[in-house]
Design a protein with these regions (language model features):
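A short acidic, amphipathic alpha-helical/loop segment
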Residues: 47-51, 221-226
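Outer-membrane beta-barrel transmembrane domain signature
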Residues: 21-22, 58, 90-97, 105-217, ...
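Membrane-spanning beta-strands of outer-membrane beta-barrel proteins
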Residues: 30-32, 42-46, 79-83, 134-138, ...
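Surface-exposed loop and membrane-interface regions of Gram-negative outer-membrane beta-barrel proteins
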Residues: 61-82, 86, 90-91
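Short glycine/proline- and aromatic-enriched beta-strand/turn motifs that initiate or cap beta-hairpins
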Residues: 17-73
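Outer-membrane beta-barrel biogenesis signature
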Residues: 5, 11, 16-36, 97-108, ...
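A short local loop/turn or secondary-structure capping micro-motif enriched for an aromatic residue
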Residues: 69-71, 217-220
């Protein structure tokens, strides 16, 4: 994924210019409540809406709707993906706790946040030209770390694992001649593991700019730019 090195450079070079305490909160006080609108690029341009709500304790919930284009043969279609997940986060120091080696005790600081999410994902294609084989709802998992200064620049590294809905030709010439779906939509045989990185610039306590890139073995690589 050719843009990943550039995004990595942006994350680490801009972190050096961060203003400590700009928003008057701890540098590792990462927020998990947000409402965002993102522009996406994955072969075709699209958009996504994301809502994240912090719950009691270390838990939070996320909802996302993503719509973009899919090319199949000589035609283009819209694909809508809805995702709902329950997540939990914790500082790495709190997660691992104190480590002991004989008489030597090591205290691990909360240098970054560890997070994990699990939920369901559904996919749908536009029009009546598709017949979805099987269940269009499937499990979705996401896990990663957040690091940097929550007052200014933050970075994120994550792994997103779920099956993807793909298009295939039904191969039925009679069906193609009549009013019935000539194409089938089905889930990929294996989980698609997307590795991604992101950068967030916190403008103030209510606003932030967001850039994310992730790779995929089943679909096109994905880029997100949002607010």
């Amino acid at each position: 994924m050719k843009y990943l090195p550039f995004v990595c450079f942006v994350i680490f070079s801009t972190a050096g210019f961060a203003e400590t305490g700009k928003l008057n909160r701890e540098s590792n006080d990462y927020k998990y409540s947000s409402l965002g609108l993102h522009l996406t690029e994955s072969g075709k341009s699209g958009f996504s809406i994301n809502l994240s709500i912090e719950l009691p304790g270390a838990f939070y919930a996320t909802l996302e709707r993503k719509a973009d284009g899919v090319d199949f043969k000589s035609e283009s279609y819209d694909k809508v993906v809805d995702t709902a997940r329950l997540g939990a986060h914790m500082g790495v120091g709190d997660l691992i706790g104190s480590m002991s080696a004989g008489d030597v005790k090591l205290k691990i600081k909360n240098l970054f946040d560890v997070f994990a999410e699990v939920g369901i994902k559904t996919s749908d294609f536009d029009g009546e030209r598709f017949n979805f084989e099987g269940n269009d709802s499937y499990a979705s998992f996401l896990a990663g770390i957040r690091f940097g200064n929550s007052n200014t620049w933050e970075g994120k590294i994550f792994l997103d694992a779920s099956k993807e809905a793909i298009i295939k030709d039904s191969g039925n010439p009679v069906c193609k001649a009549l009013f019935c779906p000539p194409y089938d939509a089905e889930l990929s045989d294996d989980m698609d593991k997307k590795f991604g990185i992101g950068v967030i610039y916190n403008i103030n306590n209510r606003s932030a700019l967001f850039l994310e890139a992730s790779s995929s073995k089943v679909t096109e690589n994905l880029f997100k730019l949002g607010y």
